[in-house]
């Protein structure tokens, strides 16, 4: 069974209605429990270095995410970073420089609708990210 590190950073995927808009509110554990189809498929460890709207993601946060990956690198077969979509591409680019040459897959995922929305894409996005990260033969050299 693959051991995967799920890194929760916030974003729409972790958001709930608060006041006059969405705000990151759900923990990584709550997000994983929202997708019962993953139970028993992976040995899943969850860390949450931050829970922010991705418009507030800064270079120091990229360094923290990279540090979390490095800290868990030897113990895990792959990594899924749950992230807001506004700045996901910037974080992915930063991580590609901060963690070069990794034979272990690192996938970033998010959603357009929060996990609690009945029309959310969050559940399938998280599920497919975990499926993809477990297929190491898809990793590019």
Question: What are the residue ranges of the model-derived segments?
Answer:
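N-terminal glycine-rich anion-binding loop in soluble enzyme alpha/beta folds
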Residues: 2-73
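Short acidic/histidine-rich motifs immediately flanking catalytic phosphotransfer sites
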Residues: 75-77
């Amino acid at each position: 069974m693959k051991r995967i590190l799920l890194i929760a950073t916030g974003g729409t995927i972790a958001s709930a209605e608060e006041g006059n808009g969405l705000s990151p509110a759900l923990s990584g554990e709550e997000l994983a429990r929202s997708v019962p189809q993953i139970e028993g498929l992976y040995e899943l460890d969850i860390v949450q270095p931050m829970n922010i709207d991705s418009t507030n993601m800064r270079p120091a946060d990229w360094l923290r995410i990279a540090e979390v990956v490095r800290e868990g690198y030897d113990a895990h077969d792959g990594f899924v970073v749950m992230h807001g979509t506004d700045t996901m591409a910037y974080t992915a680019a930063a991580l590609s420089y901060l963690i070069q040459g990794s034979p272990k897959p690192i996938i970033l995922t998010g959603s357009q609708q929060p996990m609690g929305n009945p029309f959310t894409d969050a559940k399938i996005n998280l599920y497919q990210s975990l499926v993809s990260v477990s297929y190491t033969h898809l990793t590019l050299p």
